[in-house]
């Protein structure tokens, strides 16, 4: 995304510089189009970069959360000697420990993301805090269900109730994980929207006011 945005900005800069002949006097970081509209490139470029950086951080968290769906496919499985997965029921303790580690990393990243949710992204801070709370709720559920989940011989049914969001029974963490998925989807959509809004400023510039003819 960063490379694409940089290419957009550089291309636009080269095109608009050629249109600066005549018209109102511009600041050093502004360029004007032939129709009299002006773009403050430095300001718009910073907005795009900041929005892109924030969205990238959100995407990292989103990827971690969604990775649990893939891990859930390994419930009741082990690696066969031919490289494929084969059945091994009731040995899901290490798998759940791995999921716990992923969610702990999510919680840490959300703490950092919360510090970035300032300025133009302050409106998303509530979402970030809600997602961090959802991650804590999931970790707490794992702790509460330690008798069933905190051992090597975790049954397939208990593992599914913990990390398989499509499972019918979700009383060991899957319900909290489902809420976490929904929340991070919403934040990613909002973050991407901020990027699009910043880019839109390139195509919807502010019109330069012409000098009054009454002087």
Curated annotation (Swiss-Prot):
It comes from Borrelia hermsii. It is a lipid-anchor. This is Variable small protein 13. Genes for both Vlp and Vsp families are on (usually) unnamed linear plasmids in B.hermsii HS1. Keywords: Cell outer membrane, Lipoprotein, Membrane, Palmitate, Plasmid, Signal. The lineage of its organism: Bacteria, Pseudomonadati, Spirochaetota, Spirochaetia, Spirochaetales. A lipid is attached at residue 19 (S-diacylglycerol cysteine). The Vlp and Vsp proteins are antigenically distinct proteins, only one vlp or vsp gene is transcriptionally active at any one time. Switching between these genes is a mechanism of host immune response evasion. Residues 1-18 form the signal peptide. Belongs to the variable small protein (Vsp) family. Its main location: membrane. It is found in: Cell outer membrane. InterPro entries: Lipoprotein_OspC, OspC-like_sf.
